[in-house]
Every structure is written in structure tokens, then in C-alpha cells.
């Protein structure tokens, strides 16, 4: 039994490793094997070609997508740059337009304010006489109304005017300035007080008796120095004040004061216009300040 088992085992291994010789194949078997090998080779080549084509197409697509993406990114960057520059230009243009509009609006407002001021200050237009024939009753009514208005619009008593004379010293010359002021003004009161102080001094100097020759020399020198001090108390006048005084006297002599005032109130009068606009700005600031303070209070 042991021998039989060993033989069977050896024969089974031989069967597995057994390869028939070429003479044992028939022609049909050989042809079928060759065909199968060719078919397998063709399938493998087709598969390799297909995989290569797929890989090449994928790479081409990736390259195309990469190129497109790069081109798109470049276009987007260019669009962003152009958009940024155009937006900056638009912002600058809008800023300039707003500045011009605000300047024009400010000038227009100033012109309107100045025109309204001139209309209020300017001479009133005379009412043309009416051609309507008045009856007796109408004339009585109008006369009575005029009387009532005249009683209501009685002018207050005009204050008295006083002419005062001031003496100035300009470059060693005595300049006298005559001014007409109200009697109740501070300037007039100070002028009267100064005159009252100077009168007793002049009386004292005139009532001094003549003294002897020996003692008169010393006393005369003392009195002359005192009188010199009194006379030397002259207010000095500067060149600007002298030129202003000359200009005022020239306007009075020529009678052009009213004409100059009307001209200065016109559109060409820069000083009057500037002063008026400054007053308007100051008043507007005060109104805004009062509003802010009223809102801040609880």
C-alpha cells in the first residue's frame, strides 16, 4: 500500500508538470492558438493606444484650461486696473465738479444777499401821481388820515450840536481840527472840562503883578517854564491822521461825500461789500451757536 501511494503521488506531480510535445498538436489547434495570441496582442496594443490618447487629451485639456485660466486672470487683472484707474478719475472729476458747484453756490448766495441789502438801503422809487379825481369825502378822509399819521410820526427832538476845536502838533506846526458833535457826547464833555481847567490858569497868569527887577528875573523864568509846559500839552498827530484829515476836508469842500457813499454801497464797492458779508457770517455763526447750546441743555 505504501508503494502504491508513493507511485500515485509521483504520477500526480508528473501529470501537473506534463507538457505535450509539438507533434501531439493538430494543425487546427495550432491555428487557434496563433489566432488567440494575435487577438490578445491587438487588444493590448489598442488598450495601450487608448490609454495614451486619453492621457494626451487630458493633458491637452489641462493645458487649454490653464491657458484659459491664465488668460482670464490676466484679463481680470487688466479690467481691475482699468476699472481702478477709471474710478479714481471719476472720483477726481466728481470732486472737482462738487468744488466748482459749491464755489458757484457760495458766490450766488453772496450776490443775492448783497442785492437784497442794496434793495433795502437804496433810494425808494417815487410813486407816480394818480389821475383819479378825488371827491370831497375822499379828500376829507385822506386829510384826517394824514393828520393822524403826522401825529404818530412826530420826530423826536434833535440833540443839540456843538462845535469843538482840537489843537494838534504835526511836524512842529499847529493844526486845528473843528468837529461838530452832540452836546451830550463824551468828546464834548471832555472838551468842556479841559476848557474849564485852562481858564483859571490863564486868569492866574494875567493877574500876577509886576515885581522888582532883582527878583523878577527868577520868577519870570519860572512862570515862563510853567506857561511853556501848559502850552506844550498838544497832542501829536501822525502822518496817517493828517492825510485822513486832509481827505475829509477835501470831501466837504467838493461835496462828494454822498456820492462816494453810494458808490461804496454799489457792486464795485469792495470794502462795504466785504464788511457786510463779514457781518452776515458773524450773525449766522451766532445763530448756529445758540441752536447748539439750546440742544445741549437737558
Curated annotation (Swiss-Prot):
It is found in: Chromosome, Centromere, Kinetochore. Residues 1-158, 191-223 are annotated as: Disordered. There is a cross-link at residue 149 (Glycyl lysine isopeptide (Lys-Gly) (interchain with G-Cter in SUMO2)). Keywords: Centromere, Chromosome, Developmental protein, Isopeptide bond, Kinetochore, Methylation, Phosphoprotein, Ubl conjugation. The modification N6-methyllysine is found at residue 218. GO terms for cellular component: kinetochore; Swr1 complex. Residues 1-18, 25-43, 70-80 have a biased composition (Acidic residues). The modification Phosphoserine is found at residues 82, 85-86, 116, 215, 249. Residues 177-216 are annotated as: Hydrophilic. Disulfide bonds: none annotated. The keyword Disulfide bond does not apply. Residues 98-112, 148-158, 191-200 have a biased composition (Basic and acidic residues). Residues 217-298 form the BCNT-C domain. It holds the Pfam family BCNT. InterPro entries: BCNT-C (IPR011421), Swc5/CFDP1/2 (IPR027124). Residues 205-217 have a biased composition (Low complexity). May play a role during embryogenesis. PANTHER family: CRANIOFACIAL DEVELOPMENT PROTEIN 1. This is Craniofacial development protein 1.
